[in-house]
C-alpha cells in the first residue's frame, strides 16, 4: 500500500519567477537566463521606473563628447546602485534613458529620489544633473529581447509617457503609485512638494489620467518653472 502526501501551500521560503527576475543580483549573475524565443509570460504586477537626463544634448555640446559620455556612464552607475539598494533591477538603458523594475512602488520612489539628490548635489567641481522620471505600477509581460529579459505592456508604455510630462528634477507618478499606502507615508514624511496633474497620454487618447508630480525639496529651491496647469496633454 502506498500513501501519497502532497502539500499545496506556498512555502515561506519560495519566490516567484517575477520576483527573482526583478532583482539586480539575479540579472548580474544570470544575465543570459531568458525565455525561449517567441515566448511571453505574465509576471503579475511590477513597478516600472523610466528615467531620462534633462538637456543631455546641450551637455555634450558644452563640455565635449568625451566628458559628457563619462558623466552619462557615471549616472548609469549611480542609478544602478540606488536601484539595487531598493531591491530593484535595471532592465536596460536606451540612450540616456533607464528602464528599471521593482516589486514595491515605494522602492521605486525612494531609489529615484536618492539618485536625484546625488545628481543635484555633486562633489565640488562636479556638474549637477537633472532627471526626468515616470513611475507606474501594474501588470507586465516578460519577453526575451536581445538575449535578455525585458518587460512590455500598457504599464510600461504609460511609465514611458509620464517622462514627457516632466520638466526636470521632478517625477510624474500614476494614481496606482500615488495611492499606495507605503508611498503615501514616505512622501508625507519626506515633505516633498506634490502637485496633482490630469493628463491625456499619446496612445491612450480616450482616457485622461489622474497623476501626481513629485518636486523634491532640493529641486524646489532651484526651480524657476511655472506652476503646474490642472490639465496637460502629452
Regions found by a protein language model. Name each.
Residues 6-13, 97, 144-148:
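Short hinge/gating elements
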Residues 7, 50-53, 137, 213-216:
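Flexible glycine-/small-residue-rich
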Residues 101-206:
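Catalytic beta-strand-to-alpha-helix segment of the class III nucleotidyl cyclase homology domain
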Residues 1-13, 198-204, 208-210, 215, ...:
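PAS-family sensory/regulatory modules and their coupling/dimerization elements
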Residues 21-32, 214-234:
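Intrinsically disordered or compositionally simple regulatory linkers and C-terminal tails
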Residues 20, 32-111, 118:
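Catalytic NTP-binding/metal-coordinating core of nucleotidyl cyclase/transferase enzymes
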Amino acid at each position: 500500500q502506498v500513501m501519497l502526501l502532497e502539500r499545496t501551500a506556498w512555502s515561506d521560503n519560495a519566490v516567484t519567477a517575477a520576483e527573482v527576475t526583478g532583482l539586480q543580483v539575479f540579472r548580474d549573475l544570470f544575465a543570459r537566463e531568458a525565455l525561449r524565443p517567441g515566448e511571453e509570460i505574465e509576471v503579475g504586477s511590477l513597478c516600472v521606473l523610466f528615467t531620462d537626463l534633462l538637456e543631455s544634448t546641450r551637455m555634450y555640446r558644452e563640455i565635449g563628447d568625451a566628458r559628457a559620455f563619462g558623466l552619462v556612464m557615471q549616472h548609469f552607475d549611480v542609478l544602478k546602485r540606488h536601484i539595487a539598494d531598493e531591491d530593484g533591477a535595471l532592465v536596460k538603458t536606451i540612450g540616456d534613458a533607464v528602464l528599471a523594475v521593482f516589486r514595491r512602488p515605494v522602492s521605486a520612489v525612494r531609489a529615484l529620489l536618492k539618485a536625484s539628490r546625488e545628481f543635484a548635489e555633486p562633489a565640488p567641481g562636479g556638474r549637477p544633473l537633472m532627471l526626468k522620471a515616470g513611475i507606474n505600477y501594474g501588470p507586465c509581460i516578460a519577453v526575451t529581447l536581445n538575449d535578455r529579459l525585458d518587460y512590455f505592456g500598457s504599464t510600461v508604455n504609460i511609465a514611458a509617457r509620464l517622462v514627457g510630462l516632466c520638466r526636470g528634477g521632478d517625477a510624474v507618478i500614476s494614481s496606482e503609485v500615488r495611492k499606495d499606502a507605503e508611498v503615501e507615508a514616505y512622501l508625507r514624511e519626506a515633505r516633498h512638494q506634490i502637485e496633482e496633474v490630469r493628463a491625456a497620454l499619446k496612445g491612450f487618447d480616450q482616457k485622461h489620467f489622474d497623476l501626481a508630480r513629485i518636486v523634491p525639496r532640493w529641486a524646489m529651491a532651484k526651480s524657476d518653472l511655472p506652476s503646474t496647469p490642472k490639465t496637460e496633454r502629452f
